[in-house]
């Protein structure tokens, strides 16, 4: 049913491994490239790549992930190979409407952004997020969606950071939709003014066995 959506976004939380591996799991992920054509076949149009695992395999892993997404025709937002790419909004047109996708993560699990490349991963910073939303509008976006990778894992209520970020974005009148991941469970859906906020979307493809983590949403 994803292919029937006007636009379908995924959160690709894990870096992609070189073709043929080696593959690694928690806590530093490196997953098979085969997942990307499967995502395309399922109907996803774009994936966000800003997460606490973005640089698990360094800048090489980040770059490889974006290269494979490009090769399979999947748009992406949240990490970048160049500063120019970082400053170019991801905008898709569907049924004559231009939709921007922005994405940010809360941190990198103790890793630093790649040396000399502070633009490689989008991290949560409200002034930067607002500037990006404004730039997306200036580039022609009529709808701006923001993905926020944040929260307390397995907790079914949003934390203070999630709420403060959502409030700032919604009140800016630059953003139309805010949705979140990272917590691996479903969290409440709220409305701040005219802006819908889905704080936690749950899981889709995962290996987490608690009942809360298995209660998935796809919107």
Predicted regions mapped to residue ranges:
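Acidic, metal/ion-coordinating pockets
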Residues: 1-219
């Amino acid at each position: 049913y994803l292919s029937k959506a006007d636009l379908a976004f995924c959160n690709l939380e894990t870096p992609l491994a070189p073709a043929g591996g080696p593959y690694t799991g928690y806590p530093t992920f490196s997953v098979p490239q085969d997942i990307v054509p499967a995502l395309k076949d399922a109907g996803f149009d774009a994936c966000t790549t800003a997460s606490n695992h973005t640089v698990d395999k360094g800048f090489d892993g980040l770059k490889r992930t974006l290269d494979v997404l490009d090769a399979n025709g999947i748009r992406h937002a949240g990490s970048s190979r160049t500063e120019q790419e970082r400053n170019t909004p991801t905008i898709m047109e569907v049924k004559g409407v231009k939709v921007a996708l922005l994405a940010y993560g809360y941190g990198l699990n103790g890793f630093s952004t790649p040396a000399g490349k502070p633009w490689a991963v989008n991290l949560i910073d409200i002034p930067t997020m607002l500037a990006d939303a404004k730039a997306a509008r200036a580039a022609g976006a009529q709808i701006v969606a923001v993905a926020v990778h944040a929260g307390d894992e397995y907790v079914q209520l949003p934390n203070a950071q999630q709420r403060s970020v959502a409030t700032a974005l919604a009140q800016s009148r630059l953003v139309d939709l805010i949705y979140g991941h990272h917590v691996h469970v479903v969290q409440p859906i709220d409305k701040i003014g005219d802006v819908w906020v889905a704080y936690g979307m749950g899981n889709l493809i995962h290996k987490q066995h608690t009942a809360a983590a298995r209660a998935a949403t796809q919107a």
